[in-house]
């Protein structure tokens, strides 16, 4: 009986030590991923902010947020996208 109680204690201690150090699950990252980019430039006056997609996404993208809170995916390699980002950073 003492052997099985000791074995159970060892198993529970081992299991507790094997828990990952990070308590936050991957699902807590709410940044959207983009699977396609907008084909043409948006009017600059419609954009209020931007952010980059998570590094966990398969495609790197810039997400522009419009004045109507619509999120639009754009290719960060396009010249107009870089210009819009620079403009938003300056303001």
Swiss-Prot record:
CDD domains: Chemokine_CC. Keywords: Chemotaxis, Cytokine, Disulfide bond, Inflammatory response, Secreted, Signal. One of its GO terms (cellular component) is cytoplasm. The gene is CCL5. It is found in: Secreted. The keyword Manganese does not apply. Disulfide bonds join 33-57, 34-73. GO terms for molecular function: CCR1 chemokine receptor binding; CCR5 chemokine receptor binding; chemoattractant activity; chemokine activity; chemokine receptor antagonist activity; phosphatidylinositol-4,5-bisphosphate phospholipase C activity; phospholipase activator activity; protein homodimerization activity. SUPFAM superfamilies: Interleukin 8-like chemokines. PROSITE patterns: SMALL_CYTOKINES_CC. Belongs to the intercrine beta (chemokine CC) family. Gene3D superfamilies: 2.40.50.40. InterPro entries: Chemokine_b/g/d, Chemokine_CC_CS, Chemokine_IL8-like_dom, Interleukin_8-like_sf. It comes from Cavia porcellus. Chemoattractant for blood monocytes, memory T-helper cells and eosinophils. Causes the release of histamine from basophils and activates eosinophils. May activate several chemokine receptors including CCR1, CCR3, CCR4 and CCR5. May also be an agonist of the G protein-coupled receptor GPR75. Together with GPR75, may play a role in neuron survival through activation of a downstream signaling pathway involving the PI3, Akt and MAP kinases. By activating GPR75 may also play a role in insulin secretion by islet cells. Residues 1-23 form the signal peptide. The keyword Secreted applies. This is C-C motif chemokine 5. Its main location: secreted. GO terms for biological process: antimicrobial humoral immune response mediated by antimicrobial peptide; calcium ion transport; cell-cell signaling; cellular response to fibroblast growth factor stimulus; cellular response to interleukin-1; cellular response to tumor necrosis factor; cellular response to type II interferon; cellular response to virus.
